[in-house]
């Protein structure tokens, strides 16, 4: 009788120790998962796009969205540009097998026409223009409620593209009207990069 009790008691201790080990391992796995998803301790998420092109244009752009689906801040710089305005958009695909052409059209999950970033009717990927100074550098700082880093409309895995010309924000007229409602007449693609999850700093 005593021996049976001892066996049961030892079995119980072994079970408790095993359960504790499983909990510890689960905690470690969860921690690694959080870091790999670019999550900060406050629930913010961060992404990055490294822009490269054939015309000497390059840049690094960071995306950061707070917890709870709040506003996304887009910041960084692009160099090698001609002075002035340059169209700046998130495009459909994270594909650069044929250069920036492979990125496809503007990211437009709702099938709307092109517009400015503050317009009601626009593509999700319409970020308007960035402005390059006389030194060819554009300092980028954009706040957007449309750009998401989580959920079904996340831009992670899509491409960020900077264009040769000014985006007319869908306001083109005459023979420029049709293309204005598609691309903003922003011209060729100077540089692009896939938006990826950023390492947690």
From Swiss-Prot:
Gene3D superfamilies: Superoxide dismutase, copper/zinc binding domain. Binds 1 copper ion per subunit. Binds 1 zinc ion per subunit. Residues 1-42 form the signal peptide. GO terms for cellular component: extracellular region. Its main location: secreted. Keywords: Antioxidant, Copper, Disulfide bond, Metal-binding, Oxidoreductase, Secreted, Signal, Zinc. Zn(2+) binds at residues 106, 114, 123, 126. It catalyses: 2 superoxide + 2 H(+) = H2O2 + O2. SUPFAM superfamilies: Cu,Zn superoxide dismutase-like. Cu cation binds at residues 89, 91, 106, 163. Its EC number is 1.15.1.1. One of its GO terms (molecular function) is superoxide dismutase activity. Pfam families: Sod_Cu (PF00080). Its cofactor is Cu cation; Zn(2+). It is found in: Secreted, Extracellular space. PANTHER family: SUPEROXIDE DISMUTASE CU-ZN -RELATED (PTHR10003). Destroys radicals which are normally produced within the cells and which are toxic to biological systems. May act in the parasite defense against phagocyte-generated reactive oxygen species. Homodimer. Belongs to the Cu-Zn superoxide dismutase family. This is Extracellular superoxide dismutase [Cu-Zn]. It comes from Onchocerca volvulus. The lineage of its organism: Eukaryota, Metazoa, Ecdysozoa, Nematoda, Chromadorea.
């Amino acid at each position: 009788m005593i021996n049976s009790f001892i066996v049961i008691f030892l079995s119980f201790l072994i079970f408790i120790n095993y359960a504790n080990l499983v909990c510890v391992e689960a905690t470690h796995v969860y921690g690694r998962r959080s870091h790999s998803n670019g999550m900060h301790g406050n629930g913010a998420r961060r992404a990055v796009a490294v822009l490269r092109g054939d015309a000497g244009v390059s840049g690094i752009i960071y995306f950061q969205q707070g917890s709870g689906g709040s506003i996304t801040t887009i910041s960084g710089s692009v160099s090698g540009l001609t002075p002035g305005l340059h169209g700046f958009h998130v495009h459909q695909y994270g594909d650069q097998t044929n250069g920036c052409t492979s990125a496809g059209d503007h990211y437009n999950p709702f099938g709307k026409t092109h517009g400015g970033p503050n317009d009601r009717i626009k593509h999700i990927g319409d970020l308007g223009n960035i402005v390059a100074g006389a030194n060819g550098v554009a300092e980028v700082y954009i706040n957007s409620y449309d750009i998401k880093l989580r959920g079904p409309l996340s831009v992670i895995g899509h491409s960020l593209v900077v264009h040769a010309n000014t985006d007319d924000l869908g306001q083109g007229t005459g023979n420029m009207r049709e293309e204005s409602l598609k691309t903003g007449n922003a011209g060729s693609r100077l540089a692009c990069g896939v938006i990826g999850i950023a390492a947690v700093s």
